[in-house]
Each structure stands twice: as structure tokens, then as C-alpha cells.
């Protein structure tokens, strides 16, 4: 009994030892199954989301194919002759203006939009959405007001008047050049006075051109005529500019003086930049040296390479005249246009077919405060010469002659890094013809008649003659030949030349015929 009891207890302990690891395995399996279940749940949700998106997209395509193929013919072959050709009807929008109490209202009526098929997808053509013009004008006024407020906050607090000096004279391109400068000055948002100095005396032709601007203008004339050489012309233009500065001194015009030559091109940023000058400033000028002969300006590749090598050895020069600054934006020198490549090839006379070169320092690149020219001005700097005692015959070449210390010049335009105007001289031949003021009076004659347009002043048709008479005119004389004496026109046939034909006398015709240049012309017509 004891042995059986011991054996039974041993078996029970052994069974318990085998059951304990199974319980541990069951706990581990339970946790693993929970993680797998969560993973499959997440994967199932992700697949459902993907199927939902793809199904929505597929449903849109199916809906598009089912309900829009009949109207758009997406998969119709472009060259099938059995299909009818459909034309696109372009519908216009009817606009009716109804005057109201507050303004004009626009009533737009649009027709049904059509479709155009390009590739696989159809394009719906919708009517153009015409906005209400009253609302558009209000929007423009709001934008203009905002820009004005921004300029008042971030721009110049107090703007100065601009005094533009332009030397000119009557020539073929005067209307062309003055019109360009005039429209540039008309766009200036500041008060402006335009002083025009004319060589050869003030003329009505120049006065009519500058009167169209609507600006405050001062027209001054000098007795000297413009010479026909570029060197003498530049000297006379200096004299004309000094005369304009004397007008500023006498009238005590308060503002910024700039030298706007009639053939120069100005950027609108220039007029904003010169507002920053205190006494005497300078800007960079782009030099456009040109030649009327294109063959001379087109150089071979070898010559260009040689010139590039020479420029690299000496110094690379750009066609710019203006101030040179250091890293601290302080004036240390000047950029001058290099005239060495044009040595011996520059124009001497105004109508020469050659490159026109500028002076060492052009006046158009300088601006100054008009108070420097006054006799008595507050806080006038000491490094400025007295303009009243300046002798014009001393050789005033540039505005730097007005200063005692040229280092006090203020560089403008990001210290000369911005080119704000361009210097160019383009003139016609001295003997070129042009109508005064470019006004065609009397009208020009017709050179080539337009199609389906009769010639003016058509001469009347001649009176009908009798059947047995045919008139032939010689100048103002008319000779009538009876019809019996007329010879029918025969078609000449080529005949062989023979020696006998040369010696045979030709039969003389008793009928007298009169030929003249006018009669031949009538017969040809």
C-alpha cells in the first residue's frame, strides 16, 4: 500500500511538472496572438482605405465614360469618314449698358457653353467672365491709394522739383528726339520745369513740339547756329547748358538740376534716385557708340580675339561712364569710356558714317542742387565755385569745373552700379529733307495706287468719233485719217534674210501717218 501510494504521488508530481511549462507557453501564445490580431486589423483598415480611394477614383472614371462620351466623343478616330463632323459654335456675350443713378451697370447674358476634345479629356469652354467696370475702377483706385500711402511712408518725405535742361536745334531728327524726352518727362511724378535752349534762335517749330507736353517750359534761344562737326557741337552745347544754368540762377528755381539731352534715353528710376542728392551727385551712363556703316562695325573673329587680348592685358573696359567706389561706397575715381578701339575711326562731321564718341565726362551723368547756383544760399558748401564769376571761355568741359574739390561728389544709383540712362547720338544727313514740324501740307501725291481705288483726277473720256474716222494725236494736234486708208494689222512672220532683199527697194506708201510719243502711249494702253 505504501509503495502504491508513493508511486501515485510520484506520478502526480511528474504530471504537475509537465503542466507548468504548458501554462507558460499558453500565456506567451496569448500575447503573440493579440499582437498579430492588432497588426492584421491595421492592415485591414489600410486596405479598406486604399480600396475606398481607388474605388472612388474608378467610379469617377466610369461615371465620366458613361455620361460624357456621347457628347465629347473621346475615343473617336480623327480620320474616320463615317462619323459626322461637328463644328464648334462660339457664342458671344451680349452686353447691355443700363445707365443708373450711381453709374453704369453691365448686364451680361451668356449662352450655353460648348465642349472641345483634346486628347483623352474634354475641355469645357465657358463664357468670358466680364467684370463690372465700376468695380474694376474702384479696385484700381484702391491700389493707387495703397501705392501712394506706401510711397509716403517708405519713400521721400519731401520731394524736390526737377529742373531738366535740354539743348536742341532744328534738324531732321529733332521731333523724334524731343518727343522721346518729352514723354519721359511727362511721366515724372514730381514737379518739373523744362528749360529748352535752342541754337539759331527760338523757333515756332520747336515751341510747338514742347507745348504739347503740358509741362512748365522755358524756351531760350541763342544766336549761334549749331556747327556741323561733333567737336564744335559739343562745345556749343556746353555753352547752351551754361545759359540754362544762368536762367536757374536769375529765376531762383529751387530743385534738382539734371541735363536731359534730347537724344538720350532715361529710366524712370533716375528721377527717383536724384531725389536723394544733397548738393552734387553723379550716376552711371551707358555709352552706345554706333556707326551708320554696318560693314565697318562687323569685325572678323581674329580681330575680335586680338582686341579682347589687348583689353585683358591693359584693363577690361565697359561702355559705361560713371563713379567708381570702394567697398565702403566711397568715391575713389571715375569710369571713362575707352576710345582706343575707335582711334582714327570716329566721326568728325555730323553726317559721317562712323562711330560717334562721347566726351571725357558727359553732362548727362551729373545732377546738382539749384541752390549751388544762387548768389546767396543758406548752408552753401565752400567746395563749390561761385557760378557768377565763372568764365565760359576758360574751357568748362564738365560739371566738375563748377567744384573746387571733385571728391565731394555723391555717387547715386547704388554707388554707380545701376545704369539709369543711356547716351546715344543718332543724326541724319545734313542735306536730308523733311517737312517742317513733320506736318504733311499739302498732301503727298500718290506713288502707287491702292487696289480697287481709282486714280484721282481721272481725265474725261474722249468724245466718240465716226466709224469711218480714227484720230491720231501729236502733242496738241489731232490728225484724222480716213478709214479707207487704214491698213489692217498683219502678223509678221519670220523671213529668211537674203542678199536680194537688201538691194530691193521697199514700196512707198502714199498714206501719211503721224507718230508721236503720246500716240504710242495711247496705243499701248
Curated annotation (Swiss-Prot):
It catalyses: [(1->4)-beta-D-xylan](n) + UDP-alpha-D-xylose = [(1->4)-beta-D-xylan](n+1) + UDP + H(+). SUPFAM superfamilies: Nucleotide-diphospho-sugar transferases (SSF53448). It is found in: Golgi apparatus membrane. Residues 489-503 have a biased composition (Basic residues). Residues 1-35 are cytoplasmic. Residues 471-488, 508-519 have a biased composition (Polar residues). Residues 452-525 are annotated as: Disordered. The chain crosses the membrane at residues 36-56. Residues 57-525 are lumenal. Gene3D superfamilies: Spore Coat Polysaccharide Biosynthesis Protein SpsA, Chain A. GO terms for molecular function: 1,4-beta-D-xylan synthase activity; galactosylgalactosylxylosylprotein 3-beta-glucuronosyltransferase activity; xylosyltransferase activity. Disruption phenotype: Reduced xylan content in cell wall. Reduced amount and altered composition of seed coat mucilage. Plants missing both MUCI70 and IRX14 exhibit a severe reduction in both xylan- and pectin-related sugars in total seed mucilage extracts. GO terms for cellular component: endosome; Golgi apparatus; Golgi membrane; Golgi trans cisterna; trans-Golgi network. This is Beta-1,4-xylosyltransferase IRX14.
